[in-house]
Amino acid sequence: MTNIHHHKILILDFGSQYTQLIARRVREIGVYCELWAWDVTEEQIREFNPTGIILSGGPESTTEANSPRATEYVFNAGVPVLGICYGMQTMAMQLGGLTETSTHREFGYAEVSLQNPTALFADLNDDLTACDPKLDVWMSHGDKVTRLPDNFQITGMTSTCPIAAMSDESRRFYCVQFHPEVTHTKCGQKLLQNFVVDICGCETNWTAENIIEDAVARIKAQVGDDEVILGLSGGVDSSVTALLLHRAIGKNLHCVFVDNGLLRLNEGDQVMEMFGDKFGLNIIRVEAEDRFLEALKGIDEPEAKRKTIGKVFVDVFDDEAKKLTDVKWLAQGTIYPDVIESAASKTGKAHVIKSHHNVGGLPDYMKLGLVEPLRELFKDEVRKIGLALGLPAEMLNRHPFPGPGLGVRVLGEIKKEYCDLLRKADAIFIEELHKADWYYKVSQAFGVFLPVKSVGVMGDGRKYDWVISLRAVETIDFMTAHWANLPYDLLGKISNRIINEVNGISRVVYDISGKPPATIEWE
């Protein structure tokens, strides 16, 4: 079996908003990498034994006292090191160079003129004018290197940054002031490939097939002949987790699907058909709509609704788990960004982002071991694994659906009537987006039930019914988003269908709020 962790890159995070992008780009090249906080120790790096190290960008200034620095071992480990933006500046400072706060900051597009030859820029060239090779790059920096460390040479410059790239070829130390990980840097992926494959000598073994083989082997080694329980939601992460476990241990996997009444139209039946009938998984379906709706009565505050939904899920899951007396392990669809956000970092620092609405809060007395086969994977990698395992692309590429489901898309108190109306309206919206070839052009689309009534006219009579808001956004990272400029005729068709086909809806509106200031979800 291929050792997919034999060659690996360590990325030290100095706080850049792009750091996870670096990791994803390295993985796309076909090489395993991990992202750690910048202040890891020499002992931790030795234990990880990286084939190469990348120092990320960051918001701090190297000219400030007590600004972050890499441990000195980074430069004594005998492996190639690539410094990006702040990573370049701290490498320069730590190796005897000098940085200063620039009077002319560079943010956005820049053109780097290549200078002395370097292995990092081998076969890179975006423009060639009068034998002057140049790169189109993306800059985001205030400080700049003004004096080279010993044995370094300038390999790139811009009109305002005389040292935009530098290298010490003998020690295989490379620095760029720009961000190769962002798509705006045209040759960025090739640059990273030069570093990871050609300079570090990494083999590209990080492929979907190898990851599946490795995950199945590790599951078998971890759980043996024991039985495992998994909360299957039908989402991407739990679905791929289920198929990996099923391939490894077969009927020793018990999936619990909790139908809480807050799912999309026919979603419960679709989950059972897909995983029970098609893939032959052992699934227990728990019809818990009444239990959830009863617990949510009278609750209209969003965070209180989230907590209630999470608590009831744990209670329902716990009740089912008690019936499976031979279960020794709990499986979860934890993915790598969850690990990063939960600060399961090598330094032990905790940065709690928000609680997850899954089985992470199971009672301590259950005493189950934890199986997390996706723990090393980014979301795009999970989708690739899912495709290789036979999951349909349309399911893997569905728009995000919140953990609390319709609980945060029905504003205010949750009632069955409201959920049923929203389910039907949302299904029409999504169906028409597919028909018009707009579904995959937007990043997320859904309906929101507004608990206000509006006067309408149907035939010769007036009616006083509910309002649905449609929301569609375009985004790269979901940190910021633009509302999608859907064609008026498409919006008109969707509105007409909802009002005519969903008895109880008299008005449809379209949300044209960006993020910020609005969030993508209404609650």
From Swiss-Prot:
Q: Where is the signal peptide?
A: none
Record has Hydrolase as a keyword: no
Q: Which domain of life is it from?
A: Bacteria
Q: Which intervals hold domain Glutamine amidotransferase type-1? A: 8-205
InterPro entries from the UniProt entry: Class_I_gatase-like (IPR029062), GATASE (IPR017926), GMP_synth_C (IPR001674), GMP_synth_GATase (IPR004739), GMP_synthase (IPR022955), GMPS_ATP_PPase_dom (IPR025777), NAD/GMP_synthase (IPR022310), Rossmann-like_a/b/a_fold (IPR014729)
Give the coiled coil ranges: none
Q: Molecular function (GO) terms listed?
A: ATP binding; GMP synthase activity
* EC number of the protein: 6.3.5.2
Pfam families per record: GATase (PF00117), GMP_synt_C (PF00958), NAD_synthase (PF02540)
User: What S-S linkages are listed for this chain?
Assistant: none
Question: Which keywords belong to this entry?
Answer: ATP-binding, Glutamine amidotransferase, GMP biosynthesis, Ligase, Nucleotide-binding, Purine biosynthesis
One GO CC annotation, please? cytosol
Name the enzyme's class: ligase
Q: In which pathway does it act?
A: Purine metabolism; GMP biosynthesis; GMP from XMP (L-Gln route): step 1/1
Positions with a binding annotation for ATP: S233, G234, G235, V236, D237, S238, S239
What region holds the GMPS ATP-PPase domain? 206-398
Please list the residues that make up the active site: C85, H179, E181
The keyword Methyltransferase is assigned to this record:
no
Question: Which reactions appear under catalytic activity for this entry?
Answer: XMP + L-glutamine + ATP + H2O = GMP + L-glutamate + AMP + diphosphate + 2 H(+)
HAMAP family registered for this protein in UniProt: GMP_synthase
Q: What does this protein do?
A: Catalyzes the synthesis of GMP from XMP.
Q: What subunit structure does UniProt give?
A: Homodimer.
Q: What is this protein called?
A: GMP synthase [glutamine-hydrolyzing]
Q: Which organism is it from?
A: Histophilus somni (strain 2336) (Haemophilus somnus)
Lineage, please? Answer: Bacteria, Pseudomonadati, Pseudomonadota, Gammaproteobacteria, Pasteurellales
